[in-house]
Amino acid sequence: MKYDLIIIGSGSVGAAAGYYATRAGLNVLMTDAHMPPHQHGSHHGDTRLIRHAYGEGEKYVPLVLRAQTLWDELSRHNEEDPIFVRSGVINLGPADSTFLANVAHSAEQWQLNVEKLDAQGIMARWPEIRVPDNYIGLFETDSGFLRSELAIKTWIQLAKEAGCAQLFNCPVTAIRHDDDGVTIETADGEYQAKKAIVCAGTWVKDLLPELPVQPVRKVFAWYQADGRYSVKNKFPAFTGELPNGDQYYGFPAENDALKIGKHNGGQVIHSADERVPFAEVASDGSEAFPFLRNVLPGIGCCLYGAACTYDNSPDEDFIIDTLPGHDNTLLITGLSGHGFKFASVLGEIAADFAQDKKSDFDLTPFRLSRFQ
């Protein structure tokens, strides 16, 4: 059988692409080296932030707004346990923060619902938070967090119900191109398609070693917290920048545990076995202490944690482009630790590519050619 589309990597983007392409009537094969959702990539750990007024650059705002619409649609499949939780997101940092300036600019350009608070205003609204006098907060009322593993599980199930073929626990070992399309090699045999999407995450260079993607080991952890830090008490998700420039992110507490991670830093790795479990690097358990001690002093001890990986591009912007010399193969990689919130729209972009539809978005900033 020759498929319309083969998807290599069925984590966040691949799961979405499988669903949207199958829903569009295409004959699709989803593949993954493991059984998604799983612990081997960048999507585990239950939750991911979604921010609309994007501090990483205005070019992302149209994408994230479309992503939000798609997340809202997907959430309707799980109304008892919603995939998207509109908790709000407070972005904290020094008044002269470049990141916060970008958040403010994105909000102004796109007329987003963002409220600016000074230090006293932040601490009055959320007494659990402490910030210096020179800090400001930009509160995104309409943002919140996503249940990442539930989202992937839902997409995979919906795709399967719609007739999508799924080949999991079966790594793709090679990709070949010829006049007939794309052929993938796996332990289960060879499969052909007219087009392919490569969204293999951290270890995409095992297939395409020429790509400028660097895996980085990252950790996040859950700390003891009480009901004051919960969504029920209107405690928001957050990003926070310390005076030294370190960037943190976190979520409202659930079951008396608050999850937090550090966005910058981490350990550069070159193979999967270098991504050692949480606590095997001496700094893992204390990485969030500078933020917790200064900004959330009421949070207790570290309960448990996990390791994941970022697939970093050189400039930490996404790579969304066809494989050089092969216009029938789309790459979506280099998501650099801020990609999950876009998984829905990136999956839709992939499905449009498979149908020969022109994207509604300007993807020029994400081309591979910027690194040449």
Swiss-Prot record:
Keywords carried by this UniProt record: FAD, Flavoprotein, Oxidoreductase
InterPro entries: FAD-dep_OxRdtase (IPR006076), FAD/NAD-bd_sf (IPR036188), Me_Trp_Oxase_MTOX (IPR023493), MTOX (IPR045170)
Residues found modified as S-8alpha-FAD cysteine: C308
Free-text remark on how the cofactor is bound: Binds 1 FAD per subunit.
EC number(s) recorded for this UniProt protein: 1.5.3.-
Known catalytic reactions: N(alpha)-methyl-L-tryptophan + O2 + H2O = L-tryptophan + formaldehyde + H2O2
The keyword Flavoprotein appears for this protein: yes
One annotated Gene Ontology cellular component of this protein: cytosol
Activity profile over pH: Optimum pH is 8.0.
UniProt GO molecular function: flavin adenine dinucleotide binding; N-methyl-L-amino-acid oxidase activity; sarcosine oxidase activity
Binding of FAD, residues: 4-34
Entries under Gene3D superfamilies matching the protein: D-Amino Acid Oxidase, subunit A, domain 2, FAD/NAD(P)-binding domain
Regulation: Aromatic carboxylates are competitive inhibitors.
Cofactor: FAD
Swiss-Prot/TrEMBL GO biological process terms: DNA damage response
Stated family: Belongs to the MSOX/MTOX family. MTOX subfamily.
Subunit structure: Monomer.
Protein purpose: Catalyzes the oxidative demethylation of N-methyl-L-tryptophan. Can also use other N-methyl amino acids, including sarcosine, which, however, is a poor substrate.
Name of the molecule in the record: N-methyl-L-tryptophan oxidase
